[in-house]
A protein has these predicted regions:
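Short aromatic-enriched loop/helix-cap "lid" or pocket-rim segments at secondary-structure transitions
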Residues: 87-89
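General structural feature for long, well-ordered alpha-helical segments within catalytic domains
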Residues: 1, 59-62, 110, 114
């Protein structure tokens, strides 16, 4: 009844921790894969499990367009503020002042908060913990 999509990156091993059917997607493309799965299997609950480097950077276009189309899947956005699999570099979600391997004095510049931009007519629920 439930199908998950985990892309390359921090979430690539998610299938080892969840007792659901999972598939992998190219980096940033989990929303596109989830859209296709949901359209082929409208009776299934489909979700993506994505890190911030994947979702808020490489796959930003995919999630924005999926929301604009009103695709019917759930996204779990795991935000650790860095690119975790490649050495901890600064990501689009790195907080101002948060240190990373490429921002030793802390993150800088304006930060776009993804959760605050998730207010499309198709969005049902958005929570930030």
């Amino acid at each position: 009844r439930m199908l998950g999509v985990a892309p390359i990156g921090c979430s690539v091993v998610a299938h080892q921790f969840m007792n659901v059917d999972m598939c992998e997607a190219a980096h940033g493309r989990a929303p596109a894969v989830a859209s296709g799965i949901r359209r082929v299997h409208p009776d299934k609950v489909v979700f993506t499990y994505q890190g911030d480097g994947d979702l808020a950077s490489i796959g930003m276009g995919e999630i924005v367009h999926a929301a604009a189309r009103g695709e019917k899947f759930t996204t779990f956005f795991i935000n650790n503020g860095i690119y975790g699999m490649t050495g901890g570099q600064m990501a689009p979600t790195t907080l101002i002042g948060q240190r990373s391997t490429t921002s030793v004095d802390g993150g800088f510049g304006p930060r776009w908060i993804l959760s605050s931009s998730s207010s499309s007519r198709s969005n049902r629920h958005c929570v930030k913990y």
